């Protein structure tokens, strides 16, 4: 009789963990994401092995506005994105470089990337996340969303799925103004 009580107690201890996993949303390895601040939809790779989020950008320039540090850039997605985007600089992220990204004379293990805050929408959920800027034009996906941002979405990633939650359904800035 005693082993049955132990088993029942163990089951009750596991119940809170089961309810937590039920609350998480299952996303695919790739999802469509709306960058609400920029009013643009892009395909993204959801990568639990990366810590930060990265957006493909070029012509990155730092400047000051009213004593604050800002960054300007153009999206490095395709030739049609020529608009200059300006955002407050949130900070500088140090990103560990892959060995094949370093030249024979370049010994630095980290690259410094400007980081900004962007509001992103996946499915019906929108969150403000930190995104660093780097030229990702050699990659298939212009946006990589890492584990820190995925935590904010309470996301569980199923790598067997692609575009599991469909198109973003959050209101854009233009829709909110109406």
Give the ranges of each region predicted by the language model.
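Pepsin/retropepsin-fold aspartyl endopeptidases
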Residues: 21-178
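Bacterial N-terminal signal peptides that target proteins for export
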Residues: 1-7
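Bacterial N-terminal signal peptides
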Residues: 7-16
